[in-house]
Amino acid sequence: MNLLRRSAGKLVVMGALALTGCDNVDWGGVDIAVVPPPPRGSALEGEHAERELGPLPTGPVLYYVRTDSAGGTIVPVGEIGGDSLIPLGAGADAELYGARFISEHLRRGTEFTLFRRGTRVGTLVVQSARVPASGRCRRLPVGRGTLETSVDTLPAGVEFIALAKSTAPEGQRPSIPLTATGGMMRVAPILAERALRARSSQLPGNWSSAMAQIQPFPVSSSGDAGIASTFLVDDQLAVGNDDLGYSLFMIAVPRRDLTGYDTVYVDQSRYENGGKRAPRVIDFLDWDRDGGAELLLEVYGTSRSWYETIGPVGGTRWRRGFAESCDAAVAGAAAARDSATQDTVEGGTP
């Protein structure tokens, strides 16, 4: 009998809804809203929903900051995980993931500690954030903010590494030269020539023109300076050009007896094999707090650029710890890399 009453009640409700011809019914002081269920296979069902949303980072996130005339932009690079970075939003819907990331990590008023050359130099306070219509390799959120530094006015184009204030390391002021010394400028081409000859590669016609960047960085707490250098043939450090020529990125560190340098990392990209890959060092910071500075790179392709990181492993080896996932970066994986090469220059003054 109760079953019949419940069935009858359902028929009355269904009949009332059919007669009203709308989705909202005011019936006996109770508002009833009829919401159709999502179609099967929609983006919000089960495991597919998890893939669409993507997991948000639970650890510290590394950010890239660049100043402009109105303040600065802040872009997430990756989640710090051990001696590498974990990609953000891989396989997730960009709009859904970006909205959740902004709500959790880039809310208005969020403060970030700015680092330059391994040292704390100021703060960025987020004013707004959005998901861009297009991106480098993934459409990650971009924030805008105001910068508070010891310098009253910063020119456009100044770059920083940043972490949320609550997760930022202390940083340290390294006692290394701001720019490459004369000894570094002499040693880098010698090591580059040896690396290229070992790989049967064409040598640059002019070494001064081929040296696109040379950047000192700290390799120990004692203040010893390593060298990160980029050499280019038929190319420049910018997005564009074609898939001709090659790049050579190298890391050299002082020998223990300080009588010269050892090459500990070589990354040669022959563009005809894997597409353009022209790396430059943005800055360095010991963001994983293991006692050695990691390098944040911007790598230029023919149509876009992306981020990579290089860092020490086990004290003596160096390896690429992170590369954004995009077509250009994947194609570049075919380039010749050798982190075990030990070319040595003796007698050079570190």
Tell what function each PLM region has.
Residues N2-V12:
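Bacterial N-terminal signal peptides that target proteins for export
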Residues L19-G21:
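C-terminal motif of bacterial Sec signal peptides marking the signal peptidase cleavage site
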Residues D23-D26:
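Bacterial signal peptide processing site
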Residues S69-R186:
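Solvent-exposed N-terminal domain segments of exported/luminal and surface proteins
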Residues A212-S222, P279-W287, A336:
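Beta-propeller blade termini
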Residues S220-L232, D288-V299:
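Acidic/hydrophobic-patterned starts of short beta strands in beta-sheet-rich repeat architectures
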Residues L237-I251, S303-G311:
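Structural motif
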Residues A252-E272, I310-W318:
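Surface-exposed loop/turn elements that mediate protein-protein interactions on large endomembrane-trafficking
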